[in-house]
């Protein structure tokens, strides 16, 4: 229910988890776009949050019970909420870390989706700039909270692998499923999306890979001026540069050229004018703030139990921690968002699907990763951008493969199948990969 006319390039992970009301999403395109296009052309979707919808100025006056019903009882995904308290209960009643980890992970899933909803509601009252920044902050708040707890526990590799897994999952699994399902629904034609935007987004991902590549190369070529410290210093410097670049990127989208884009709803007839319907926010400003605080606190609480149970779950299930961090955490933690991307593709709105998949990858790689390095710096943790050779090579190859699939501006179910199969190869690789830095976990 976002309300502000924020330009595209605003696509947060959790917002696309609003599966039950995706029909109301606003689409954005250049004013000069051809009116024949049914799928919205979203220029450079990706870094902040999804497109905001138009909201009216009407402020709801809900009771506490009404607010609870709207936020908690209106979404079927919230049926998973009881798994969180159950995980906490098991923590004190049993030593089975495998079950504690699984229940914590499932319990966090609906919280991530509701965080996106509360952020949308608050954005109705803040204006486009603040609304965009809110979504930049809360877009991947679940991953950030888990990462901060892992940093506090000294589990630097878990932080690196979890963030890497989110990027890989979005680029291969989410995008692949969207292409595959959309291709099956529209099997008689090739679905199209904005080729120019996809190329720009691919370039941004390559920039992020560059930031991760040089520390790894410096480490494995043994060419550091000061062994051990040069790699960390380069990582911290590069992280600051990436954050500055990301901030400039947001400023350009939110301030410099917001008038270059106009909201657009799906066209029912090529000769008809499109229009946007104002929508009333469902909760008030203070309700949104309170719910954001409650949900963030609840995610933080569950994240502590989740991180604490990772090692035990690895031993209990006889699964490498790297596989849990790279594969299981992103898949389950972003389940609602994945469903949203698939639904958009099945409605022939591939630009939005790309915003979820590629956009979230950009946000994590250009914001979440360097942010964690800076936070680790402040905490005295030696978190760096050296994700090790195997992991960095995997990310680099993935970006190249995805860029190759996006270069034509079309998709079909076969391309989607290829991306899914690529993800299975990556998953199998991490299952048999022995992390040489296991002690850092």
UniProtKB/Swiss-Prot annotation:
Residues 139-174, 333-368 are annotated as: Cation selection. InterPro entries: CaH_exchang (IPR004713), CAX-like (IPR004798), NaCa_Exmemb (IPR004837), NCX_ion-bd_dom_sf (IPR044880). Residues 91-97, 151-165, 219-231, 308-311, 376-384, 434-441 are extracellular. GO terms for cellular component: vacuolar membrane. Keywords: Antiport, Calcium, Calcium transport, Ion transport, Lipoprotein, Membrane, Myristate, Palmitate, Transmembrane, Transmembrane helix, Transport, Vacuole. Coiled coil: none annotated. The keyword Membrane applies. A lipid is attached at residue 2 (N-myristoyl glycine). A lipid is attached at residues 3-4 (S-palmitoyl cysteine). GO terms for molecular function: calcium:proton antiporter activity. Belongs to the Ca(2+):cation antiporter (CaCA) (TC 2.A.19) family. Cation/proton exchanger (CAX) subfamily. This is Vacuolar cation/proton exchanger 5. It comes from Arabidopsis thaliana (Mouse-ear cress). The lineage of its organism: Eukaryota, Viridiplantae, Streptophyta, Embryophyta, Tracheophyta. The gene is CAX5.
